[in-house]
Amino acid sequence: MKALKIIGLSFIAMISLGTYAQELDANLQFRPRYEYRNGFKSPMSNGEDATSFVSQRSRLNLNFKQEKLKAKLTLQNIRSWGDVSTTATADKNGVAVFEAWAQYDFSPNWSARFGRQVISYDNQRILGEIDWIQQGQSHDAALFSFHPKNHQLDLGFAMNANAENLVAPKTPYTTNYKSMQYAWYHTQFGKINTSLLLLNTGYEFEKSVGNLEVDYKQTFGTYLVFKDKKWDSNLGLYGQTGKNFNNNVSAWYAGANLGYALTDAFKASLGYEFLSGKDQDNTSLTVKSFSPIFGTNHAFNGFMDYFYVGNHQNSVGLQDAYLKLNYSLKKWQFTLTPHVFNAPNTVLNASNEKMDSYLGTEIDFTLGYAVQKDIMVSAGYSQMFASATLERLKNVTDAGNTNNWAWVMISFNPKLFSLK
């Protein structure tokens, strides 16, 4: 807390000594969340017990603006209640930098941003903030943006190392990607918003003893959004090619959603996603499984995180058909989303026989209540009805009959001050 006070006072001093028009906004976020996990991410085996815990995010956000200069600093502490003693002299995770960037606006249409920053576009299927996880997701990157009226072109660049090395390391860098470049373009044609993305990610690996190489994988595609008075829809199409650990990549993704507002308070949507995969009896070394690399994957394919949240990589792919029902009433919001999952590629049992493609059904229910402007209470309950095929994919034997997950979260977002 002493460090945070010093930082805050330093920013205030900058304001008082400045000679230009300046703005400084400071706000906090405290977000404790209780979770009950009984088959979260994978079916529970008989004999295993459910678990529960409380995690918390605590953030300080500072936003600075001075004519053509903008800057943001976000510090955070992520903890599980009880991970340190009540008399601890140091925190387990300490205070970390979530965002720390500066931006210069060359003109109303051109800007450049450097530093630790969130990179998030469209529906966050490929590039997202992952706000659900307490730590979120941010990148060390440079961003150049050209944004005249009705158009935006962003060019991003990143290169990573594990330290200020004096010579080239002898072991591969595996903390993250070694390098990344992307171009994102957005425009509007009437009622259709169109985005194009080209993303190039390079991962370092040891090809042979003492021989480090970087393989590059390309993700490219489009995201379209249509909105009318009562109708809205979106369509995402992406492909992946390149190399992954010296293996060729050939994968693709398609996702679509169609929504209709029956009343001002009630909306229904139908959606479908296809993520390519590979038959388990396919001996080819080609990577055919699509990977939503930096996406906010918790928001897709069920909230119980059975797919693509640190799992289900280089697997049989996924088909997800879902119905989403939204209802709002004054300060309340309710959402019910059933998902039906299928494997688009062959799954084999222990006898190498083809199994049924049906993976299971998940039902997600969430609600939210706005206590006041800066306080939000939300909760949810999810249940997965897993098939034998899904249990096989998750390598679970003797699975229990009930797999469910429940959570309650409170978000406090008070504004400390705003100086102009």
Describe the residue ranges of each PLM region.
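N-terminal secretory signal peptides that target proteins for export/translocation
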Residues: 1-2
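Beta-barrel outer-membrane channel/assembly domains of diderm bacteria
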Residues: 7-11, 17-119, 142-148, 152-153, ...
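Outer-membrane beta-barrel and related beta-rich outer-membrane complex signature
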Residues: 40-42, 85, 126, 165-169, ...
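Envelope-exposed proteins and targeting segments
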Residues: 98, 138-140, 181
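Asp-box/WD-like beta-propeller blade repeats and closely related beta-sheet repeat scaffolds
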Residues: 127-131, 139
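Internal metal/ion-chelating core segments
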Residues: 146, 151-235
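Glycine-rich beta-alpha junction loops
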Residues: 200-202, 241, 273-278
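C-terminal outer-membrane beta-barrel translocator/porin domains of Gram-negative envelope proteins
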Residues: 246-253, 269-317
